[in-house]
Amino acid sequence: MVTLREALRSDIEGIYQIEKACFSTPWSKEALLDDLEVEDKLYLVVEAEDGKIIGYAGSWLVLDEGQITNIAIHPEHRRAGYGAKMTRKLTQMLRKQGMKHIFLEVRVSNIAAQAMYRRLGFTAVGVRKQFYSDPVEDGLIMAKEMEELA
């Protein structure tokens, strides 16, 4: 059984290992820790039964917009629904924080992630040319509009 929870400072090593396993140009451990500790950020982790971090997600809150910065699942644990669970939970948390719009970027070649985001209500709204490096690639901007809380 896995646990989905808010990230703690003590999770930084696990988050960093996921970052290195998933991204060709990973954030440094220091950058991740700095980001984790800022008040207007939300971070989640997926923790395995043995306590190992197998995924994480991060977001920034800017005015009434949430920017999902990273969603990463260790390659050995992909296709098990953890990415969708984290995205749903992060979306709920951003909504509770008053965010009216949520944005993210995804590599144009990452068809699986795009399909997941579409299933969760995100739509493509633009392209950031040469947004990614190693390899250089465009980033598809996807957005989700949040309904008002009743």
Describe the residue ranges of each PLM region.
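Conserved hydrophobic beta-strand within the GNAT/NAT acetyltransferase core sheet
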Residues: 68, 102-106
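Short glycine/proline-centered loop/turn elements that form peptide/ligand docking sites
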Residues: 83, 87, 110-113, 130-135
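Active-site acidic-Proline motif in GNAT/NAT acetyltransferases
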Residues: 74-80, 108-110
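Conserved catalytic-core motifs of GNAT/GCN5-like acyltransferases
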Residues: 105, 118, 123-140
